[in-house]
Amino acid sequence: MYKRQVRFFNTVGPRQVGHYGMVVPRFVSAALKNEPLSVYGSGDQIRCFCHVDDAARALLLVMDSDKAVGEVFNIGNNQQVSIMELAKKVIELTGSSSTIEKIAYEKAYPEGFEDMQRRVPDISKIKQVLGWLPEINLDQIIKDIAAFNSK
C-alpha cells in the first residue's frame, strides 16, 4: 500500500461559509454588508490562511509523487497575521465602512475556553521534498472570497 498523510491548516477560499466559526469568510461577509466584525479576546491571536487552490495543488503533488510515499506533510501557508490585523485588512480590501467589535472570551464561550494564541504550520518538509510553496497571499485570498460573495 502506498500511504501518504497530510495535515491541512486553515484552508480558505471562495464558496466557504462562516457558519462554523471560519474567521475569513465570516469577516468578509460582514464587511460586504458593512456590519461590525467581531474579534474575540485581544485580537492578538496569530493565524495563517492557505487558499484552497494552493492546498489542492499541494495535495496533487503529494498524491502524484513517489517521494511522498510513507510521509506526512503539513499543507498550509506560513504568512502570519493577527486576527485584529486580519479584520483591518478585510475592511480595507473590501472598501467597507464596518467597525471592529472586540468581544471578551467570557461573553462568547463557555467557562474554561482557551484559544490557541499562535497557529503556524511548518511547511519546510513539503517544500524540501516536493518543492511546494503556497503562491496565493492573504490579500488575494480576501479578494477572491469577496468577489465570489459579491456575485
PLM feature segments, named:
Residues 1-2:
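Conserved small/polar residues in nucleotide/adenosyl-binding loops
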Residues 11-25, 35, 40-44, 52-53, ...:
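Glycine/proline-rich active-site loop of Rossmann-fold NAD(P)-dependent oxidoreductases
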